[in-house]
Every structure is written in structure tokens, then in C-alpha cells.
Amino acid sequence: AQSVFEVDCMGLLNIAKTLNSGKDLAGNDLDEPTNFYIGATGNPGAPDLEIERQKLAAKIKNGAHFVQTQPIYDLEQAKRYIDKMSEFDVPIMLGLIPLKSFKMATYLHEKVPGINLTQEILDRVEKGGKEAGTEIAIETLEQIKKIAAGVHIMPLNDIDTTLHIINHV
């Protein structure tokens, strides 16, 4: 089987925006407009934040109401991203994945574009495993509260740890 990509992210945003305006994709009036709250992605770890800013401008033009980012572990990087995107009147929710192991942390850092773990975090998770990863998530969430509109936690099937993090904060 082959994947079929008939619509890219900008096209999908535009479709939702069009439906919210009360039109279908052929331009016909809908009985009622939809009321989608349209989200888009952002990447604080992008190598060029100016290009990322231009992408976000296009996403907002095409209907995005809010942004959810890649997971962040470098708060200075997150602050630079928030500052660079401050011209836009959309809430930015920073992503957070609680680290379960050193293997997971290393994989995210080395293999997933836009996810950058500091050496301090890698060292802590190497020594303390999942417990250290949970502590880092709590500390990171405390800082996110100060700089962003919110956070979206990606629990990766570990609801108990996520609840522990939320209850701590």
C-alpha cells in the first residue's frame, strides 16, 4: 500500500477555516458554519527561527488559532521561540514528554528533529532513570507556566506518571 497525501498541513488548515466560514469545499453555503478551534504545530528546536516564524505566519493566515510545539527540554530555547513568535496573537502550548529512560532520552535527542536535550538532562536521566525523568518534567512544567499559554503533555501510554506530574504542579 502507498500513502496518499492529497492535502498538506496548510491545505488542511484552510479547509477547516473555510468550513468555519460557513462554506463547503466547493464554495456552497453550509446550513451552519463549523466551529473548529484550529491548531498548528511549532518547533522551538528549528535551526532557523526566522523560517519557523514565517511558517507560523502562514499557518495563522490559513486559520490556526493556537500552536502546540515539539517537546521542549531546553527552556532557553523555548523562551527564544516564544519571544520570536510574540508578534502573533495565538496561544502557544509547549510540548512535554516525560522521559522514561536514558535510552529514550538519547533516542529523542539524536533521532527526532527539533528535540534538543541539554547535557545536564541527559546526565540526570542516565543516573536516575524514570524517576529523574519525572522530576525533570515537573521542573520543566513549573517553568513553562511562566512563559507559555500552556503545555501539552504527551504521556506515551504512561498515564500514572502524567497524573503524578500534574498533581505536583
Set out the residue ranges of the language-model regions.
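Active-site glycine-rich loop that binds ribose-phosphate moieties when present
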Residues: D24-G27, P47-N62
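Catalytic beta/alpha-barrel core
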Residues: H65-D74, G150-P155
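C-terminal helical cap(s) of enzyme catalytic domains, especially alpha/beta-barrels
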Residues: A1, F5, L12-L13, A78-I82, ...
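A short secondary-structure junction signal
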Residues: L49-K55, P71, K79-Y81
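Flavin-dependent oxidoreductase catalytic cores
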Residues: F36, R124-K127, H168
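Conserved, mostly hydrophobic/aromatic
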Residues: K59, G63, L94, V151
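Active-site pocket-lining/capping segments in soluble small-molecule metabolic enzymes
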Residues: S3-D31, T41-A46, E87-T140, N157
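Non-catalytic positions within long, well-ordered alpha-helices that form the structural scaffold/packing
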Residues: I60, I144-K145
